[in-house]
Structures are given as structure tokens and as C-alpha cells.
A protein has these predicted regions:
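Rossmann-fold scaffold of SDR-type NAD(P)-dependent oxidoreductases
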Residues: 10, 71-80, 121
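Conserved glycine-rich Rossmann-like NAD(P)H-binding loop of the short-chain dehydrogenase/reductase
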Residues: 28-41
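Conserved residues in the N-terminal Rossmann fold of short-chain dehydrogenase/reductase
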Residues: 36, 58, 98, 192, ...
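Hydrophobic/aromatic anchor residues within beta-strands of the central parallel beta-sheet
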Residues: 56, 96, 119, 159-162
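N-terminal Rossmann NAD(P)H-binding glycine-rich loop of SDR-like oxidoreductase domains
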Residues: 5-27
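Strand-loop microenvironment adjacent to phosphate/nucleotide-handling motifs in alpha/beta enzyme folds
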Residues: 113, 143, 147-344
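Conserved Rossmann-fold cofactor-binding substructure of NAD(P)-dependent oxidoreductases
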Residues: 55-76
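Conserved Rossmann-fold NAD(P)-dependent oxidoreductase catalytic core, especially the SDR/UDP-sugar
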Residues: 79, 83-139, 143, 147
Length: 344
């Protein structure tokens, strides 16, 4: 897949970048470039992998010059750099705009100018029917990606995207928070017991990006079908695994910008989506601004579709949630008495 090629990962010191390195550094890939702002994380990654194929570039996706410096000679790009913490983006929405929207414009423009073969942009379920600044900025990121892709027919570059849900045990997510509270002897804090979230492992997220990389055409967005669970079921399954079933739970209400459930495909997208077994492909709307010719061609299929959300997908019970938790290195480390580290 990547034989003798150069891959650039923006925001590459996070969990996604680490997983890609683990999977591909020992293949025939020529080079993997990590582009990010945090020199400490880059140094940690350099020491962890200690591989001459791994190159590091300090920079910010907001700065086109630093992006271009890292982009020279690159064959493929995985664009993972983002501000993703919902409460932080609520209080600093313009920072989300600068990184998630303008930063994406910089990455895509640099890739096109550099004649990169394929770019995959990573998005989130919060981009669908967004109610918070992070989701709005990611929705706009997708729009930027699709708009750019319209002009790439006949060029050497293909730009597509992915959209995924909650990556379990990621930094800032609820599983590491629950564990911290347990270890401190505090009650678990649940925002709303009925709140549901899609549940994906890190390996699922990497598989989704690779599927998009191999199958995507310009403007496509890919979604992986995923199960969901209520926060109450997740908490119960975790307490059961750790033999803390009598531990107290406090219901505290939702945080800034939170939804009761998340949506991976809107009703309108589901009407046009292509079912590919484990995945959905959302094709771009390729109509131009000459809407007059579409006036008499209505789309009745939209009224017959429904969105794909964490309330209407496969729902995990406590047994199913327990089985999924056991797939996580974070949980295996806990059960083995090792220090568990949340993935970035």
C-alpha cells in the first residue's frame, strides 16, 4: 500500500499517528513525516519508535509556510490535526476556526500545489447537526474539503474524508475520567444516564482511514458502522470489570455543547449514501450553482430516509460493552496492574 512512498500525518503525535506508525513503520514505506506543534510529544515519539524512517516537522497547520515545508516530496497525507475538545472550543471558538477550518485549507492547498496523490481528512460525528463550536468547525472543514475536491478532476490529487465517533479511552474522554475518579475514591460523574455515544476502538479508526485511502474518490466521506451504548451501561460495564459494582454514581447534567446522542450521517446524507457493508460512502453533491435546471427534479427519497445516530444503531448491553472494553490496551493495562495511559 505504501511501498517506497512518503506519508505525512498532520497532528501526528496523537493516538491516531501512533497507531499508524505501529502498523506501517516496519513495512516497505519510505518515510513517515510527523507534523505537529508539540516538540515534547515529538521527542517522546522519536525515542519510542527510534526508526530512521520517521521524520519530524515542527509547525502549525495555521501557518502555510510550515505546512509547505513538510509537504515537499510527499505522496500521501492523513490530516488529523485539530482542536477537538468540545468545552475548550465553546470558550475559544475562533481558535477552532483557525485550526480546524483555516488550517485544513492550508493543508489542502499545500497538498494540491505539491501534487500529493491522496489526502484523507479526519472528521467527527459532531460535524452532523452541530450544536457546538467544535462540531461547527469540523462541519466547515468537511465543506472546505468537498469544495476543494470539485476542482481536482484531471489533476494528480484525490481528496476525501472520514467521519467517526467516540474513540474509546482517548484523552479527554469519559473512560479515563471514570478511572481517575475510581482511583481517587470519588463518585463517578455521569452527565445523563440515557446519553448515547458511538463506540469505536483506535484500530477501528485507523481501519476507516485506510479504507477511505484505498477506495475514496474526490469529495467522498466514509463512515464506519459502529455500535453505541448509553453512558450508564458504559459505567456499569467498567465497574463490573474492575470489581467496583457498589461504587457510587452522581448524575451531574450535560457539559457545554453536549448532545443527548450523536449522528454519523444526516437524513439527507443517508438518502444518497452507498452501503458498503461495514461502511457508508457519502458521495459529494456535484451539482453546480445553475439550480434552475433542477427545479423540476425533486428528490422524494429524502422524505423516506432517516439519519444514522447513536440512538438508532446497534445498542450494546452491559455484556457487549464489557467485551468491547476488553479489547482496549487501556483496560488490559488496568486489569494487569500496570499504569494505564489514555491515548492522545
Amino acid at each position: 500500500m505504501f511501498d517506497k512512498k512518503i506519508l505525512l500525518i498532520t497532528g501526528g503525535t496523537g493516538s491516531f499517528g501512533n497507531a499508524v506508525l505501529t502498523r506501517f513503520l516496519d513495512t516497505d514505506i519510505a518515510e513517515i513525516r510527523i507534523f505537529s506543534r508539540d516538540e515534547k510529544k515529538q521527542d517522546d515519539m522519536r525515542k519510542k519508535f527510534n526508526n530512521p524512517k520517521l521524520k519530524f516537522y515542527i509547525g502549525d497547520v495555521r501557518d502555510y509556510g510550515s505546512v509547505m515545508n513538510a509537504m515537499r516530496g510527499v505522496d500521501y497525507v492523513f490530516h488529523a490535526a485539530a482542536l477537538k475538545q468540545v468545552p475548550s472550543c465553546e470558550f475559544h471558538p475562533m481558535e477552532a476556526v483557525k485550526t480546524n477550518i483555516i488550517g485544513t485549507e492550508s493543508v489542502l492547498e499545500a497538498a494540491i500545489v505539491s501534487k500529493v496523490a491522496r489526502v484523507v481528512c479526519l472528521s467527527t460525528d459532531k460535524a452532523v447537526y452541530p450544536i457546538n463550536a467544535m462540531g461547527i468547525s469540523k462541519a466547515m472543514m468537511e465543506k472546505v474539503m468537498v469544495a476543494k475536491s470539485r476542482n481536482l478532476e484531471g489533476t494528480e490529487t484525490v481528496v476525501c474524508g472520514t467521519r467517526y465517533g467516540n474513540v474509546m479511552a482517548s484523552r479527554g474522554s469519559v473512560i479515563p475520567l471514570f478511572v481517575e475518579q475510581l482511583q481517587a475514591g470519588k463518585a463517578l460523574t455521569i452527565t445523563d444516564p440515557a446519553m448515547t455515544r458511538f463506540m469505536m476502538t483506535l484500530e477501528d479508526a485507523v481501519d476507516l482511514v485506510l479504507y477511505a485511502f484505498q477506495n475514496g474518490k474526490n469529495g467522498d466521506i466514509f463512515v464506519q458502522k459502529a455500535p453505541a451504548a448509553t453512558i450508564e451501561v458504559l459505567a456499569s460495564a467498567l465497574l463490573g470489570l474492575l470489581q467496583k459494582t457498589t461504587h457510587s454514581i452522581d448524575v451531574i447534567g450535560t457539559r457545554h455543547g453536549e448532545k443527548l446522542f450523536e449522528t454519523l450521517l444526516s437524513r439527507e446524507e443517508m438518502a444518497a449514501a452507498e452501503d458498503r457493508g461495514d461502511y457508508y460512502r457519502i458521495p459529494p453533491d456535484l451539482r453546480d450553482l445553475n439550480y434552475g435546471k433542477y427545479v423540476e427534479q425533486g428528490e422524494s427519497r429524502i422524505s423516506n430516509s432517516e439519519d444514522y445516530n447513536s440512538h438508532n444503531t446497534e445498542r450494546l448491553d452491559e455484556v457487549g460493552m464489557t467485551q468491547l472494553l476488553l479489547k482496549l490496551d487501556f483496560i488490559q493495562d488496568l486489569l494487569a496492574g500496570r499504569t494505564a495511559q489514555a491515548i492522545d
